[in-house]
Amino acid sequence: MTVAGYAREDLAAARPDDNGTGIPARRTAFDDLADLAARLSWCWPALLALVLGLYQMGRPELWRDELASWSFASRPVSSLIASARHTGATQLAYYLLLHGWIAVFGDSADAMRTLSVLAMAAAAACVALVGRHLAGDRAGLASGLVFALVPSVSRFAQEVRFYAPAVLVATLATLLLLRALDQPTVPRWLAYAACLALLGYTDLVALSVVAGHVAGAVLRLWYDNDRRQLLFLPAAAIGLAACLPIAVAGASQANGQIGWIARPSPTLTAFAFFGRNLFYSTSVATALIVLALLAWTVAWREAAFITALAIAPVVAVWLISQGPHSYFFPRYLLVTVGAWAILAGIGLSRLDARIAAVAVLVVAILGAGDQQVIREPGAHDWPAYPVGTGGDYNDFAGAATFVAGQAKAGDGIVYQSKKAPWLMIGYGLQYYLARDMPHGVPVPRDLFIAQTAAQAGTLYPVLCKHPAACLGAEPRIWVVGSGRQKSPYQAVTAAQGKALRAEHYQVTLIKHVQGLTVFLLTREP
């Protein structure tokens, strides 16, 4: 079987097995063990990614993006579809998948994150299969293991978002493309087109991998001179055309979802930040680049193909982001990490098996510190890691534990509605209060809410226009605001504060937790 114009045995011959004498080197037990492991090259990376994904996956608190996923996926299907008309259309497929998952396994952090862990483990298997397809068993095994060891892979395996499924589908699309280029038959091209369509409905930005596929397909056509490979063009067009409805819906919602992303600059500083944040480790990123360079010395054709997959999507998104909306943020291009791992795997396949094993171990050691940091309780609130950390996060679980320990039947609660609804303090407290409240004591009623987000089909609830009319006879009201606040009125609007004062509520308790302040207001007799 040929691999991008080479016979697989040619690539194997590139490894230093004969010491330059032409006489095969003596095989050792370690070589036999390495070959056995290589034949199962897809299995071991999947297992490693699964173990790393499950390890301490419940320790980090849910952060606002995960809480948004929980909010949408917890709605009835009819409400979820209606909500997509206003926001979250591009994530609708993931929300529907998560909705079904929650119906079976529940909505604990561990349960919801397990879906992403399984997707990332499957992605590791696909990375190994792509590496094996290109450069043989050992390259596949090394590619998959390196991928599983990248800290950002574990980080987003533990994220209740669409990133891990997108990485899986994108890597599967690359594998299907390689199979179609090897044997350009209509069924194989249709499978590739269907996978692209699925990718678009999983994550529109992940379709940037098609830029890499175009470059790779051109290279293969140049190598092989097989005109049947031109069927790539209609296959890709079919897959992309199927995504037009979701692209149109997403474009109308872009300002509300990604308006915070700055237009990227062409500076080295900007790209250095991008690289560090893409891998969640400066040292691992450096190691992968070094190993990627080594790949060019053993199989430059395969290296060129995969380098296109690693770089072309980034360039494409950078160019698109010069327009009205910017999509240039590292986690949106997580789909390129697999390509860097495959380059590293091809480079490692040139080395003696023992040296390659040591190199993989070095990658693990280099990323060990980052692997621990991304499992800290507040780690998911550090989207710019390894830049911008320092312990800051919103301790929703701590605030909920405090409220639940002091709560009484009939209490009301007000979440910060002033200036920063995107902090999702309400979602965070509601999620953890539902798990912490004592038996027989209901979760405090959310005051000043005219419609819940599910009822309104929006991301945020609709506030009462006349707050005084929304107050009941609650003898006590909890107010939860962001940061270290001195007064509950810093967290509420002027109209809400006026309504509370008119009912003669006085502050009787203040509790500061990480990132939040909890006030208890008691009505004067």
Kindly label every feature range from the protein language model.
Residues 1-35, 362-366, 525:
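Short, intrinsically disordered terminal tails adjacent to the first/last structured region
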Residues 3, 30, 37-524:
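Membrane-proximal helix-loop-helix interfaces that form the catalytic/acceptor-binding platform
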